[in-house]
């Protein structure tokens, strides 16, 4: 009996971020809203779909590319942090990104130090 083994490569989307952490550095509580953009590339061979991006806190709001990203193309996730009403000091927040990629979940992080407004 002869058994033939055939290797098949299935098409998959694959997300690759340029960075997964962004540090805002120091900023004043007088300017509590900070924004950054995470750029990603579909390095797979099937269209990539971001199913959701969920922040760990209501002070952090992600918005993301809704249409499928073709292989080799780029997409973005813009994250807005609003420190208004928050205590000054260091913060670190996460954004959980779920996609149809070969790695279903990726976690992004933002951090920084909101400095106290000096009273005169």
Language-model features, listed with the residues they occupy:
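Terminal connector regions
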Residues: 87-116
């Amino acid at each position: 009996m002869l058994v033939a083994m055939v290797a098949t490569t299935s098409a998959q989307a694959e997300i690759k971020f340029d960075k997964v952490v962004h540090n805002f550095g120091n900023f004043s509580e007088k300017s509590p809203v900070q924004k950054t953009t995470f750029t990603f590339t579909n390095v797979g061979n099937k269209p990539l779909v971001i199913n959701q991006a969920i922040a760990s806190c209501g002070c952090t709001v992600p918005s993301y590319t809704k249409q499928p990203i073709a292989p080799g193309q780029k997409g973005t996730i813009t994250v807005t942090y609003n420190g208004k009403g928050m205590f000054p000091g260091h913060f670190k927040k996460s954004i959980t990104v779920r996609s149809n990629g070969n790695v279903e979940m990726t976690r992004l992080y933002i951090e920084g130090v909101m400095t106290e407004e000096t009273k005169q």
